[in-house]
From Swiss-Prot:
The gene is IL10. This is Interleukin-10. One of its GO terms (cellular component) is extracellular space. One of its GO terms (molecular function) is cytokine activity. InterPro entries: 4_helix_cytokine-like_core, IL-10, IL-10/19/20/24/26, IL-10_CS. Keywords: Cytokine, Disulfide bond, Glycoprotein, Secreted, Signal. It comes from Meriones unguiculatus (Mongolian jird). The keyword Disulfide bond applies. It is found in: Secreted. Residues 1-18 form the signal peptide. The lineage of its organism: Eukaryota, Metazoa, Chordata, Craniata, Vertebrata.
Length: 178
């Protein structure tokens, strides 16, 4: 009899769902993500506006780093990987170098980086936004072009950060519809 009672308890517990406020974090974040998406992008844009003029003045190059092919990757099947790789690119390569170009912007760049990290964390919690494995050739091209520009690459990449935010928004909008 004790084993059947244990089996009954296990079946009962398996059917019990958590109350409304007790969903696992990732499921809750996925449910509320459409609401927070607009807020996160607004915060990213506001943080970027604090450093945008600095980098626009320093960027003397006519070429575009974040090309149409990258934007197409964001809208296509490689969108997940392009987003993931570009966030990593800005956090690991661009922003640390950018901090060295002006102590007056370091605090604002740190704030921008933290907001980007928060976005990445929220995207990862809701697996349908970052379920990716493949590499994006467009991101590789951006990285190669960035490295070829040497010191000027930082100015170019930071000057085009608003294009990156627009790519993030386009990607998330597509994912919200699917």
């Amino acid at each position: 009899m004790p084993s059947s009672a244990l089996l009954y308890c296990l079946i009962l517990l398996a059917g019990v769902r958590p109350s409304r406020g007790e969903y696992p974090r990732n499921e809750s974040n996925c449910t509320h993500f459409p609401v927070s998406q607009t807020h996160m992008l607004r915060e990213l844009r506001a943080a970027f506006s604090q450093v945008k003029t600095f980098f626009q003045k320093k960027d003397q190059l006519d070429n575009i780093l974040l090309t149409d092919s990258l934007q197409q990757d964001f809208k296509g099947y490689l969108g997940c990987q392009a987003l993931s790789e570009m966030i990593q690119f800005y956090l690991v390569e661009v922003m640390p170098q950018a901090e060295n170009h002006g102590p007056e912007i370091k605090e604002n760049l740190n704030s921008l980086g933290e907001k980007l990290k928060t976005l990445r964390m929220q995207l990862r919690r809701c697996h349908r936004f970052l379920p990716c494995e493949n590499k994006s050739k467009a991101v590789e091209q951006v990285k190669n072009d960035f490295n070829k520009l040497q010191e000027k690459g930082v100015y170019k990449a930071m000057n085009e950060f608003d294009i990156f935010i627009n790519c993030i928004e386009a990607y998330m909008t597509i994912k919200m519809k699917s």
